[in-house]
Amino acid sequence: MNRATLEKDPHEVASMFDAVARRYDITNTVLSFGRDRFWRRATREALRLKPGDKVLDIAAGTAVSTAELTQSGAWCVAADFSVGMLKAGARRDVPKVAGDATRLPFADHSFDAVTISFGLRNVVDHVEGLREMARVTKPGGRLAVCEFSTPVNRPFRTLYMEYLMKTLPEVARAVSSNPDAYVYLAESIRAWPDQEALAHQIASAGWSNVRWRNLTGGIVALHIATL
């Protein structure tokens, strides 16, 4: 077994993602029924990036999300603490930096926008991570957090949780190089704050004008904020 626990020890989490790196992108596309592409595009559009903007994409993994952001004409750098994930994305021509979300290797006020997609949930202290994101963002800059969340329709929520806890791990066994990691995925999603609670946590970390948009019925929530 190579999976992290909900204690989210950084070394365990990084090791787990190193183990899934080889088939990470295809596994996510299969498990999300192709919706991952829509979620990445929605994140890019919500940031309203301009050519020349400097963007930090945290927990970028194989840099597939970073490549999407570059379609805006912005200059984007991918950061992740899993070296294996960054290596798996070597063919994507964007700058890549190994770094921990709670100790980013960048100076204050370096970026016009910071984004983290499906990674905040894996940070050992995600509120501290949000503060660190604020530190490296210029005054007036933007934050986008795209993360699994709580479906808004109760019957759909019940079906989704059934899929998450039972079906998803079974499908992962067929397509993933480390299916146990997807047991952690399901458990961490179930334990994650809902949309409103996360919005309050983002605000407590120093961000303002926090709002969110539900995607795919609330399976994913896209939180946007400014500094």
Curated annotation (Swiss-Prot):
Belongs to the class I-like SAM-binding methyltransferase superfamily. MenG/UbiE family. It comes from Mycobacteroides abscessus (strain ATCC 19977 / DSM 44196 / CCUG 20993 / CIP 104536 / JCM 13569 / NCTC 13031 / TMC 1543 / L948) (Mycobacterium abscessus). GO terms for biological process: menaquinone biosynthetic process; methylation. Pfam families: Ubie_methyltran (PF01209). S-adenosyl-L-methionine binds at T62, D80, D100, A101, S117. Keywords: Menaquinone biosynthesis, Methyltransferase, S-adenosyl-L-methionine, Transferase. Pathway: Quinol/quinone metabolism; menaquinone biosynthesis; menaquinol from 1,4-dihydroxy-2-naphthoate: step 2/2. GO terms for molecular function: demethylmenaquinone methyltransferase activity. Transmembrane segments: none annotated. This is Demethylmenaquinone methyltransferase. It catalyses: a 2-demethylmenaquinol + S-adenosyl-L-methionine = a menaquinol + S-adenosyl-L-homocysteine + H(+).
